[in-house]
Amino acid sequence: MTGASSGIGEATARQLSAAGFEVALIARRGERLETIAKEIEAAGGRATVLVADLADESQTTSAIRRAIDALGQVDVLVNNAGFSPGAAIEQMKRDEIRNIFDVNLFAALQLVGEVAPLMRAQGGGRIINVGSLAASIPAPLAIPYISSKIALHTATDALRLELVPWNIDVSLVIPGFVDTAVFDNAREGAQHLRQDPDNPYRETMFVLDDLAKKNLENALSPDDVARVIVRAATARRPKPRYYAPFSALLQSVFMGMLPARILDALLTRIYQLDSR
C-alpha cells in the first residue's frame, strides 16, 4: 500500500487489515507509519512499515523487496501515492515535473514490475491503481499531475491485457473530490507564488482555491474511497474500473462527449480565464 501515511492510503490500509489482509505500509513519513502500524496491530491486524521516497528508484526497489521478504507473498498491490504542486508550467523546472511523474506514474509501474513475477509464480494476484477524475477534466496549474494520471489510466488498461494470461487482475479506482491533504499540500507548496504580486497566475490560483473549497464541501471522505478499493481487492471478479462516487463516471463521460471547442469555452468560464 503506497501513500499509506495519510488520506486514502491510510484509510485503505486500515480497512484492508480489518478485512483480513496483512498490510505493508509504504510512505516517506516513518513516524506516522509506525503509529498507524501500532494501531492496526492493536486492533488485531498485522502491519509492516517500509519507509521510502518513491521518487527514488533504489528506495522503491528496496521497499517492495522488503515487503516481499516480510509478507512472503503479495496478493494485492495498491498504488495510491501521488501529489500535485499547483503551479504553472513556466514556474516549474524540468526536475520538478519529473519528480511528479516519478511518484505518480513511474514508481507505480516499477512496483508492478517487481510484483508481477511473484504473482505469476503464485498463480495470480491483484493490482489496483488509484487514478483521478482530474484525468478527465483539463485544468490550469496542474498539468504535470493531470498528465501523470492520464498516463496511469492508460497504463492500467494496458497492464490488464498484459497480465491477464497469468490470472493477475488489474483495476483502476477513479475518485472524484476527496477530503484529503492533497489540496492543502498543493497550496502550501506554491504559497510563495500566491504571495507574489507579480505572478501572472496569481488570480487563477485564488479562483482554483475557491473552486476546491466548494468542491470539498460535498467531497468524499478517505474512508469512502477506501471501501471501493477494498471492494476491488476482494471481489471475485473485479471490475476494470471503479468510480467513487458514481457521479465521477457521469462527469468523465460528459467531459469526453463535449467537442474540444465547447469544452474549452465551458472550462474557461468556470476557471474565469477570459482575457485579462
Regions found by a protein language model. Name each.
Residues 19-36:
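Conserved glycine-rich Rossmann-like NAD(P)H-binding loop of the short-chain dehydrogenase/reductase
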Residues 164-216:
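C-terminal beta-strand-loop-alpha-helix "lid" module of Rossmann-like NAD(P)-dependent dehydrogenases
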Residues 88-89, 96-98:
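Substrate-binding pocket helix/loop in short-chain dehydrogenase/reductase
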